[in-house]
Amino acid sequence: MKQIDVFEYLPQIMRELKKGILVNTKNGDKTNSMTIAWGQVGIEWRKLFFTTYIRHGRFTHEQIENTKEFTVSVPIERTPEIAKAIAYIGSRSGKDINKLADCNLTLVDGIEVNSPAIKEIPLTLECKVIYSQEQEIDKIPAELKEQFYPQNVD
């Protein structure tokens, strides 16, 4: 892995985020990935940030709460195999299965975090949690709740 200037890749990160990218975690010997399609890159407190929202009920949330770190994998080329893997990972919990192994994805050690990168999706953002906040579902407009939270999941 090599370090990159995130701002050079920002258009690609934002384009791919709308289609779905991966958040990866590792806690002890348990790794997990989750598909996300909302997030943002920005600057807070003079630090480069990647912000995403992960609900309490998700295994990924538990992993991040325990480790305070994660990686984000962004496809440079969205091949049919990568698209299929991202869809599969987004449709199952990793609590009892190894979604990455099921998709034949190869884990690569992070440089500054213990959470893995994915060899087949080499554009990786390494992230450490420095701030978290509860999302107030009741403040989300009704039309967005209906569209993005149809199951009324906490």
Residue ranges of model-derived segments:
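Active-site-proximal mixed secondary-structure blocks
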Residues: 1-36, 40-154
